[in-house]
Amino acid sequence: MKLDDFDFDLPDGLIATRPARPRSSARLLVADGPETHDLTVADLPSMLRRGDRLVLNDTRVIPARLTGTRTRMSAQGEVTARIEVTLMEPQADGTWSALAKPMRKLKAGEKIIFSNALQADVHAMDEGLRLAFNVEGDDFDAALNAAGAMPLPPYIAGKRAPDARDYHDYQTIWAKRAGAVAAPTASLHFDEHLMDALTSRGVDVTFVTLHVGAGTFLPVTVDDVTTHKMHAEWGEVRATAAAEINATKAAGGRIIPVGTTALRLIESAAQDGTIHPFEGTTDIFIYPGYRWQITDALMTNFHLPKSTLLMLVSALMGKDRMDAVYAHAIANQYRFFSYGDASLLFPSQKGQTSR
């Protein structure tokens, strides 16, 4: 299975840099087995049945992009450098793994000043940058919220800088557990009106947590995709969530994760149609040939060429079907990636229909 098999040409103008307003007015491409329907996210309830269960990721994106200064003494006196930092994930010893630009201007033991309230010591660099901050807990959260910016994906950040609108736009309406440095973007389409409509339809929801890491944007660099090593992310399926999902399966309802993050987590926690409580890291890599455990359908945005997420949806729907879905999306001017439109995928090989 070759990486080039998952390539496609995407016009640059189809990369969304702002979300639809209102959220649920985004377009929704429904691939129901061999059938294709062009709808909007507001139509989602009509495509679901009473007793279906949506699985939602309640992670909260932290403002992980920081700009600070590093000062050191030289023969010419005090020298200051501007440093841009993106936090990756917290470590067991209290430090944060991070990326920095320019990395060459940092040495272990130096200090980066981000604001009067927030600074960090360069703790280590031999196996990647580690930062030790001067505050923790609620004080760290407050200082980070004041000094940080939302960590927009590179395909958006390359076109514009993050601004105040992104603090709202790049966060789900139910975001609760802080720790992600990227949003579960399919969930960005949900607003209160849509949630009310789903409740009226008799569609159930369950919340799980997967803290999306910056590794989600890393490219696949191997030609044989089956040899790719996925990044690890921390997630939790609580006992109540597992019980809700199992009850839906037992009653004949469908389990429909919203977003690939929720899907990867529940597949990690499931075996032979039953999901179990789970807490820890997962590096599950889903590509064509994968044996599905718990997922019946998926709502997700449109993904990058050659990405692991495109491989995931190809595993669910079949590669030829996904090639046709993406060709339809491009021909009909759907907007792609994090702030773009959505798809609702019902695989025909499982004998499912949308109603």
UniProtKB/Swiss-Prot annotation:
Query: Which Pfam family, any one of them, does this sequence belong to?
Result: Queuosine_synth
Tell me, what is an example of a GO biological process annotation in this record? tRNA wobble guanine modification
The entry lists its GO molecular-function terms as:
S-adenosylmethionine:tRNA ribosyltransferase-isomerase activity
Tell where it localizes: Cytoplasm
Pathway as given in its UniProt record: tRNA modification; tRNA-queuosine biosynthesis
User: Does this entry carry the keyword Cytoplasm?
Assistant: yes
Q: What is its EC number?
A: 2.4.99.17
What is this protein identified as? S-adenosylmethionine:tRNA ribosyltransferase-isomerase
Q: Which gene encodes it?
A: queA
